[in-house]
């Protein structure tokens, strides 16, 4: 990798070499500054232009661009080029629905039903939902969008025995939590949520409009009602380039 080296004299007259600054880092800093000062949708100069301007290879340019795409600062559109990305959607970690979260940020939430049906609970899922292994579980898979842009793939699991005819109720209610409250008088009170990272599979990338292998945020939520009974187990995959989660922390009381 090409580097820039400069030198200066110290008070004693000796030559002191300063730290090497790889051209790659100068290029990436330039692009990063661009994402901070330019409006979303601003095109990034072509690879050959950047390579000539920074006297580096197109391979180096490609690496810098790809890293900023992964970080969600740039957006690559097939056949069109690379552009400054929109700011990430910021979501507080709290027990609210996707619909509530998006509307709180002035975004219009919509969902596309990918699959709905019954599966048989294995030992792990049975334990999460407090049902017998082999029991029926309603599995709902949805593509979550904000202002028409795909954001996440959400897969929800609920006990079919505890929530009979829920599948039909969801025809009337667009929000699952509203259906649980109004039809079954079940209100979520608390949940344990785990956040991990994963890489987009070909199917996930196709649904979310991202590159295969792009870092994803994988959330697992296990929710309980006011009596402490399990209500749902949800696994969601969010676009790492478009989403960030925010937690507010407090020191424990002495």
Curated annotation (Swiss-Prot):
Disulfide cross-links: none
InterPro entries linked: Bact_HTH_transcr_reg, Chorismate_lyase_/UTRA_dom_sf, Tscrpt_reg_HTH_GntR, UTRA, WH-like_DNA-bd_sf, WH_DNA-bd_sf
GO BP, sorted A to Z: negative regulation of DNA-templated transcription
DNA-binding region: 47-66
MF-aspect GO terms: DNA binding; DNA-binding transcription factor activity
Induction: Induced by (GlcNAc)2 and (GlcNAc)3.
Highest taxon above the source species: Bacteria
Keyword annotations from UniProtKB, A to Z: Cytoplasm, DNA-binding, Repressor, Transcription, Transcription regulation
Knockout consequences: Deletion of the gene results in a bald phenotype, mutant fails to produce aerial hyphae and spores on glucose-containing media. The mutant is arrested at an early stage of the developmental program.
Domain HTH gntR-type: 17-87
Cellular compartments annotated: Cytoplasm
CDD domains on file: WHTH_GntR (cd07377)
Regulation: Binding to the target genes is abolished by GlcN6P, a central molecule in N-acetylglucosamine metabolism.
Gene Ontology cellular component list: cytoplasm
Pfam families: GntR, UTRA
Function: Global regulator that is part of the nutrient-sensing system. In the absence of glucosamine 6-P (GlcN6P), represses the phosphotransferase system (PTS) specific for the uptake of N-acetylglucosamine (PTSNag), and genes involved in the metabolism of chitin, as well as several genes involved in development, thereby linking carbon availability to morphogenesis. Also regulates the expression of the ABC transporters DasABC and NgcEFG, which are involved in N,N'-diacetylchitobiose ((GlcNAc)2) uptake. Binds to the DNA consensus sequence 5'-ACTGGTCTAGACCACT-3'.
Protein name per the record: HTH-type transcriptional repressor DasR
Organism: Streptomyces coelicolor (strain ATCC BAA-471 / A3(2) / M145)
């Amino acid at each position: 990798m090409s580097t820039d080296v400069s030198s200066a004299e110290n008070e004693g007259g000796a030559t002191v070499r300063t730290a090497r600054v790889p051209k790659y880092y100068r290029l990436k800093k330039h692009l990063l500054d661009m994402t901070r000062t330019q409006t979303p949708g601003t095109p990034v100069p072509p690879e050959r232009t950047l390579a000539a301007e920074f006297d580096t290879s197109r391979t180096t340019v490609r690496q810098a661009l790809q890293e900023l795409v992964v970080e969600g600062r740039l957006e690559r559109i097939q056949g069109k080029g690379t552009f400054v990305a929109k700011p990430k959607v910021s979501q507080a970690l709290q027990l609210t629905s996707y619909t509530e979260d998006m509307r709180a940020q002035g975004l219009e939430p919509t969902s596309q039903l990918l699959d709905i049906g019954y599966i048989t609970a294995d030992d792990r899922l049975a334990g999460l939902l407090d049902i017998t292994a082999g029991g029926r579980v309603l599995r709902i898979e949805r593509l979550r969008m904000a202002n028409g842009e795909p954001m996440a793939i959400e897969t929800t699991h609920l006990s079919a025995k505890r929530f009979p005819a829920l599948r039909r109720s969801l025809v009337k209610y667009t929000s699952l939590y509203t259906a649980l409250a109004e039809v079954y008088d079940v209100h979520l009170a608390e949940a344990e949520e785990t956040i991990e990272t994963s890489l987009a599979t070909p199917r996930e990338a196709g649904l979310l409009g991202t590159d295969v292998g792009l870092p994803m945020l994988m959330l697992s939520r296990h929710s309980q009602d006011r009596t402490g009974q399990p209500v749902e187990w949800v696994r969601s995959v969010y676009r790492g380039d478009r989403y960030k989660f925010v937690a507010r922390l407090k020191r424990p009381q002495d």
